[in-house]
């Protein structure tokens, strides 16, 4: 009942459930042992927008009611903007930027976060031109020297390719792992 499922769902088979119902069942199962931490990996992927919003609303309410901490792993920036307080932006397995969602999305400091924000279409999806980030991710089977994003970054300097970037705390409290943080804006 906490996740919005009628009792009849208990007797149903997985193939009889919609995508949203299956997500709710998964969430209900994960809450059975009263966890303090709930990790949700792409919890709203492949759901229609209305069902996504319902699931997110339910998750936020469960977080409040049960006092459970929620970590969401997602590539959907709209989900982050709607349902999260903090965001950690990762590239090649490293957190490159961390902070309050509003601050990071409004004024991203890391060149990867800035490039990621530019990939979001400003127009309706039917007419939007999707802009990707040029280049390829690094080979993660080998140790990365310097910044993992350097080969794709238009602002990269020699230091970026040769030295691991420092973690810098910005005036607003966000943390950025970049040699250029705060001093240079990524050209759009």
Question: What residue spans do the PLM features occupy?
Answer:
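Conserved ABC ATPase signature
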Residues: 13-17, 21
């Amino acid at each position: 009942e906490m996740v919005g499922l009628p009792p009849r769902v208990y007797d149903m088979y997985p193939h009889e459930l919609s995508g949203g119902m299956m997500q709710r069942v998964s969430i209900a199962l994960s809450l059975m042992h009263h966890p303090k931490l709930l990790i949700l990996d792409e919890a709203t992927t492949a759901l229609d927008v209305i069902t996504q919003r319902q699931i997110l609303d339910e998750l936020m309410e469960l977080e409040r009611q049960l006092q459970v901490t929620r970590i969401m792993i997602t590539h959907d920036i709209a989900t982050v903007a709607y349902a999260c307080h903090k965001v950690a932006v990762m590239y090649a397995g490293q957190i490159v930027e961390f902070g309050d969602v509003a601050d990071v999305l409004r004024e991203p400091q890391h060149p990867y976060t800035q490039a990621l924000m530019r990939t979001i279409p400003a127009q309706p999806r039917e007419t939007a031109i999707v802009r990707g980030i040029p280049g390829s991710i690094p080979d993660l089977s080998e140790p990365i020297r310097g910044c993992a994003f350097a080969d794709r970054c238009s602002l990269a300097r020699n230091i970026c390719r040769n030295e691991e970037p420092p973690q810098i705390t910005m005036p607003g409290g966000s943390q950025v792992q970049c040699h250029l943080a705060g001093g240079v804006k990524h050209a759009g």
